[in-house]
Amino acid sequence: ERVCCGYPMSCKSRACKPSYCC
């Protein structure tokens, strides 16, 4: 599963903008 780069959350989290995913 991809993560929200720079943030301790998953890319699926509403708080993570798609552009932050890696």
Swiss-Prot record:
InterPro entries: Conotoxin_mu-typ. It comes from the Eukaryota. The keyword Transmembrane does not apply. The modification Cysteine amide is found at C22. The keyword Secreted applies. GO terms for cellular component: extracellular region. Signal peptide: none annotated. Belongs to the conotoxin M superfamily. The cysteine framework is III (CC-C-C-CC). Authors confirmed the assignment of this toxin to the M superfamily by cDNA sequencing. This is Mu-conotoxin-like pr3b.
